[in-house]
């Protein structure tokens, strides 16, 4: 998130996490994959891999909503009032934002629209989603889908975090390990290709700019407050959050390396 380095100054433990991740994030944002995104085919292949990270991000935030609010019947109050409010507001934007035509859509669906417009293949991700619907099981569905092992490792890590039921860890990975990792360079590459008439990428540019806009103005401050609320003064929780963030950022880098390898075949 663009404003995170300013906001972390308000809490020493948040500073610790941010400092811990600076080097890893710089390496990720300057990854060589962005140097080879020069053609329509490059961007298509990138999106065909990256869409799985977009999908499992939605499961990450929904896990927080499930744990921090009451989504069961009959309803009962939840003790996490502040964190619950914050996560509900974040879910509203992530799950029910608007597209270029003003229609309500999740950010995942916005990304699929972008893939369709740019000509990226959506067969594998759609097949995976259908298996999720049929099986009602992530583990069974991912094992039945022919995915690269690194993409599977990336998603398996996310679900390991979710299954830990440690809300402070889930919130921290959501905040530091996922929201802040769309490099400006990628957006500029897409804009450049779009201006050269090589691709029609209105939906993708909208998705990327919308993601950054919502994050900078709303999700960044909300997510930081949520981490403070969930970790409190517990040093063990802060340590667990930092370790998970470090691994999440490294796996983000590995996920991009796979896309880079595809380009070099």
Go through each PLM region and give its residues.
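Single conserved hydrophobic/aromatic residue that forms the stacking wall/gate
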Residues: 251-265
């Amino acid at each position: 998130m663009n404003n995170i380095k300013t906001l972390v100054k308000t809490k020493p433990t948040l500073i610790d996490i941010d400092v811990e991740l600076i080097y890893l994030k710089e390496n990720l944002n300057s990854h060589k994959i962005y140097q080879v995104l020069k053609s329509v085919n490059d961007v298509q292949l990138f999106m065909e891999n990256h869409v799985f990270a977009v999908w499992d991000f939605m499961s990450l935030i929904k896990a927080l909503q499930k744990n921090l609010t009451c989504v069961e019947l009959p309803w009962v109050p939840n003790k996490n009032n502040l964190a619950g409010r914050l996560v509900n507001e974040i879910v509203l934007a992530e799950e029910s934002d608007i597209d270029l035509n003003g229609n309500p859509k999740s950010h995942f669906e916005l990304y699929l629209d972008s893939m369709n417009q740019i000509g990226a293949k959506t067969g594998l991700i759609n097949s995976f989603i259908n298996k999720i619907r049929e099986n009602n099981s992530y583990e069974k569905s991912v094992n039945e889908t022919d995915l690269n092992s690194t993409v599977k490792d990336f998603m398996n890590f996310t679900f390991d975090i979710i299954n830990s039921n440690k809300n402070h860890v889930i919130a921290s990975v959501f905040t530091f390990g996922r929201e802040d990792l769309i490099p400006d360079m990628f957006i500029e590459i897409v804009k450049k290709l779009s201006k050269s008439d090589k691709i029609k990428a209105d939906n993708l540019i909208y998705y990327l700019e919308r993601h950054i806009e919502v994050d900078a103005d709303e999700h960044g401050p909300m997510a930081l407050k949520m981490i403070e609320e969930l970790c409190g003064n517990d040093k063990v929780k802060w340590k667990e959050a930092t370790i998970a963030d470090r691994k999440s950022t490294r796996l983000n880098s590995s996920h991009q390396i796979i896309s880079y390898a595809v380009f070099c075949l």
